[in-house]
Amino acid sequence: YNFFKFSDGGVLMARYGLRGGEFGNYTTSKDRIGSINMAYDAFEDLYKAVGISPKDISLGGGLAIAFGARGRGNAMAHYELDKNVINMTKKRGAGSLAHEWGHAMDAYIAEQFGVHGFASANLSKMPESVKKLVKAFKEQDGKETFFYESSKFFDGEYKKAGNGYWSSAHEMFARAFACYVKDKLD
């Protein structure tokens, strides 16, 4: 969309209504410019795929973004619920924005119903439409979905990530959302 024309993070704040942005101490000027421009392109894809306005990317103005600033071990990117910030790692975050925004949207939905956390993990307090969506990740026609079976398989293969991480409702929500965005863009 922009062909690497932006050199200042202000464009992300203005276009998408983000609350703030942060760069890690070890990001070079070149890293920062690359991150800004890749995030711009990813956000352009995201709002078009979801069918919202660019400003709605910030989920009511509360979402922030960081680049190489808040890394966690081997993660490519992560969403911090308590800070409402998406962190893209310096070297491995490319392609992860839709997934992390899915986590942010999950939290935003919960917030709309007075719940701190993820809507997908607090179904008893959510409307039927959210319950039905999350249930569809795990079960169709009384049988476990391939998506859920595969997620449980990864739970067994990658135990270091935490027991049940891959098959947790909030992780499945974010992965399903990222797939939805990809399908809409194809």
Predicted feature residues:
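Active-site-flanking segments in enzyme catalytic domains
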Residues: Y1-N37, E44, K48-D186
